[in-house]
Amino acid sequence: MAIIHFTKVHGSQNDFFLVDEEENHITAWSDTKRADFAIKLCDRSHSLGGADGILYVAKSNKAGAIGQMRVVNSDGSIASMCGNGLRTVARYLLEKHALTDAKVETMKAILDVRKATSLGFDIPTYQVEISPVKFNPESLPMYVGVEKLFNQVIPELDEELAFSAVSVPNPHLITFVDQTVLDSDKQEKLASFLNSENPYFPDGVNVSFVKRLNEDAIYVRTFERGVGFTNACGTAMSACSLIKKMLDQDTLETPLNVYNDGGRVQVTAKKDETGDISLQLIGNATFVSTGSVRYDDIVTELTNEATVEQAQYQELVQEVKHFLKTTG
């Protein structure tokens, strides 16, 4: 039996339990045990309301990194990256170490994180690097008849929609659609198919449908691999922003407002001297509550104390809903 203390967090209402492995004395846990705990704690029928996954925070042995983030989805699978989750981990570690910027180790890269100017309503806001960005098949296993998929119709997937695929570093399949397609069940059917046994994306893929709102704003809805539909997916919003900029030949560094069912973020991009692209995701890092559970064969709630931050965030959500309603 173990008593586990947590912080319930969210980025764009993509919610997680943040668990500090060192403070909870669970650094020796196996991946199997981490997965089992995630499956049980993240169940939406649990008294704590469940979550999209667990963010395990640990010490890093990489030079310059102040900590390590490991993401386990609600189904027990491991996510190589989570942009919304990283913002909350960035806040947790920066506050813990009394810093305003640092580096955090993720599965595929050591990424820059920093405190940022609030996007509104004094909501705690953080900026995190999203990289590496790759289009090559080695980073994005797919069998759709092309090595690089950019704005192309793949009849096996859909007769009309043009798709792009990119890894950041988890895999994303992206298409731009109108409201009629958004209102249909096309995304759910396609994403469910591509995240079950299929000949096109053997490891599954995050599937995003994107609607243009204006020159400086898009709306993104994502079916996440291992989770399903979520309020928002940070890496998806970053990837969709990049594809939009490439399609429109926009300046990479210009901030793009990205709206989603969970709120709003901003994304910028840059290309270094070698041609490699990195993205910057800017958005909320909200701490919803702190509490503890007892973990043995089941996970039992012991304590759970709410903060005032979620009420604060709802002001932004109402602003977003009004914007989406009036923009159409």
Curated annotation (Swiss-Prot):
Q: Which InterPro entries match?
A: DAP_epimerase_AS, DAP_epimerase_DapF
Biological process per Gene Ontology, one example term: lysine biosynthetic process via diaminopimelate
| One family name in Pfam for this protein | DAP_epimerase
Site feature: Could be important to modulate the pK values of the two catalytic cysteine residues? H172, E224
- Reaction catalysed? (2S,6S)-2,6-diaminopimelate = meso-2,6-diaminopimelate
The gene name on file is dapF
Where is it chiefly localized? cytoplasm
* Function recorded in the entry: Catalyzes the stereoinversion of LL-2,6-diaminopimelate (L,L-DAP) to meso-diaminopimelate (meso-DAP), a precursor of L-lysine and an essential component of the bacterial peptidoglycan.
What protein family is recorded?
A: Belongs to the diaminopimelate epimerase family.
- The EC number of this protein is 5.1.1.7
Identify the catalytic residues: C82 (proton donor), C233 (proton acceptor)
Q: Domain of life of the organism in this record?
A: Bacteria
Compartments, record wording: Cytoplasm
Is Amino-acid biosynthesis one of the keywords? yes
- GO CC terms of this entry: cytosol
Native species:
Listeria welshimeri serovar 6b (strain ATCC 35897 / DSM 20650 / CCUG 15529 / CIP 8149 / NCTC 11857 / SLCC 5334 / V8)
Q: In which pathway does it act?
A: Amino-acid biosynthesis; L-lysine biosynthesis via DAP pathway; DL-2,6-diaminopimelate from LL-2,6-diaminopimelate: step 1/1
Q: What is this protein called?
A: Diaminopimelate epimerase
Q: Which GO terms describe its molecular function?
A: diaminopimelate epimerase activity
Ordered alphabetically, the record's keywords are: Amino-acid biosynthesis, Cytoplasm, Isomerase, Lysine biosynthesis
- Does the record bear Amino-acid biosynthesis in its keywords? yes
Oligomer status and interactors: Homodimer.
Q: Indicate which residues the UniProt annotation says bind substrate.
A: N14, N73, G83, N84, N170, N206, E224, R225, G234, T235
